[in-house]
């Protein structure tokens, strides 16, 4: 089912990557990173720089289109969609940096960021910048990234490395961009799913970072266009991942149901009777379609409502903030329900490596562990709805 938001030409171009992705799927699983042809195709598509502003020759796609592109790529392969999501989210960093630094990092057409914002490093203030050290986790897309994010607690070496506090008494956090040659990659990505993302750890040791190559991730962006008025909008590409994975699972079961004997449901096989003829299979597919349709509608409507506020330069009210974050979690949980239920129906089609149902199941189980979409995020959303402070700066 298509929406008015997934008719952008880039969505069709993403769909056309299917043969390239299929050809490289086994290699991506084995090598645990995207293949060079897939990376090149995604660069040509602009999938890694969806939020780069037009002034830097970027596409500056509206958030609904970002979701739609990631959804389609995730339908083709969860790892491909995940890498697009991470890089697209990273491209919002262009809104934090001063113009010259933004052009230096985000002007090249092959720009691709990896990493995340958890402050696991240490930054010491020096003249003109910071000295950064630390180990950083989950560098999704690190195998083809042109820059990696290093987020750090700012510490004071003069006081035994005590955290520096901001004017509100909170620990000061500084994020910075590092070149791949400034870090050491650590082979840690041996996981349940999303094998091809190459989400390895990386380390930096006493790297000097200029002020202009760093930013306060809790602060406001420098750019003032609608796409950069609400910093948590950088999460929006994430919403497309579960929708695409769930779509792939439904399509996979439908494809196998005509050729798979009904004994898969535990009964005795009947002559000439396929899985598609069993009521349990029919019910499961119908429920999955309804659940996915509802989750998609809620996702796109929530993002569109938020976008209307930003385009009108209006403040995002608390309820809208709560629903935006809850939407992220909801989409992932619904997709997990779909993939688990269809894996049960698919039986042995869900346990062998290379089977589409198995791939969807392991990918969504892994995706749902991300801290930005975990069910615990319902709590701060609920706090807002009940008139309390969220207790979470990202909500």
For each predicted feature, which ranges?
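Generic structural signal for well-ordered, non-transmembrane alpha-helical segments
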Residues: 244-247, 286-293, 325, 329-336, ...
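C-terminal helix-coil-helix/basic helical segment that borders enzyme active sites and/or dimer interfaces
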Residues: 22, 26-29, 293-329, 340-346, ...
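Glycine-rich beta->alpha junctions and the first turn(s) of the following alpha-helix
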Residues: 192-292
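Glycine-rich phosphate/cofactor-binding loops in nucleotide/flavin-utilizing enzymes
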Residues: 348-395
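DPxDG-like acidic metal-binding loop motif
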Residues: 135-183, 198
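Internal helix-loop-helix
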Residues: 44-106
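Well-ordered mid-protein domain cores that form the structural environment of catalytic cofactors
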Residues: 91-128
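N-terminal glycine-rich anion-binding loops that anchor highly charged ligand groups
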Residues: 33-49
